[in-house]
Amino acid sequence: MKLFDYAPLSLAWREFLQSEFKKPYFLEIEKRYLEALKSPKTIFPKSSNLFYALNLTPPSAVKIILLGQDPYHSTYLENEQELPVAMGLSFSVEKNAPIPPSLKNIFKELHANLGVPVPCCGDLSAWAKRGMLLLNAILSVEKNQAASHQYIGWEAFSDQILMRLFKTTAPLIVVLLGKVAQKKIALIPKNKHIIITAPHPSPLSRGFLGSGVFSSVQKAYREVYRKDFDFSL
């Protein structure tokens, strides 16, 4: 079986990325990911959500990109069942999962900047449906092992996704939180898209709270689309 048998990808993205899927680097990603999936190890997010960020936001609908590093590797209990926190969207968690510290800080800053009520759950899929691509640079992870799937090679694929999007004519608003995400600035054509940077929202990082990052995003969105982005959840 092929990757897309385990991890569905929408027709719009298959057409947009068609030439990538036969390249040696992608065939190697497919091989390594399927090997990990078939091993005794537990892989997050579940394979059906591997491309959830892409499936919720078609290429033609992307207006904002909020880049993450890799999926949450932790679990939570629901009805005595251990479930993955990760759901395939950067920073987002399953509806009934506890809100992680980084996401709590995102909600705090969003409220401080724009007065958006702090939501009771951490599912950001509504943002994705409104045109915010919530893409992780690395798409999978082993349970309880942060950054364990760097070896798979996902970043080569996510870089291609970004570079293809950056070739579009409409200005994109690219939000890069933290030094790792900000390395992607090198991929972005100069003077074509709007780049907004801030420290990582992790409590271990300093400077995110009070950065005004969401005020900057909203200002840029108004300039490009003549309306506000709806951050409500």
Curated annotation (Swiss-Prot):
One of its GO terms (biological process) is base-excision repair, AP site formation via deaminated base removal. The keyword Repressor does not apply. It is found in: Cytoplasm. Keywords: Cytoplasm, DNA damage, DNA repair, Hydrolase. Its main location: cytoplasm. One of its GO terms (molecular function) is uracil DNA N-glycosylase activity. GO terms for cellular component: cytoplasm. It catalyses: Hydrolyzes single-stranded DNA or mismatched double-stranded DNA and polynucleotides, releasing free uracil. Its EC number is 3.2.2.27. Pfam families: UDG (PF03167). Belongs to the uracil-DNA glycosylase (UDG) superfamily. UNG family. Excises uracil residues from the DNA which can arise as a result of misincorporation of dUMP residues by DNA polymerase or due to deamination of cytosine. HAMAP family: UDG. This is Uracil-DNA glycosylase.
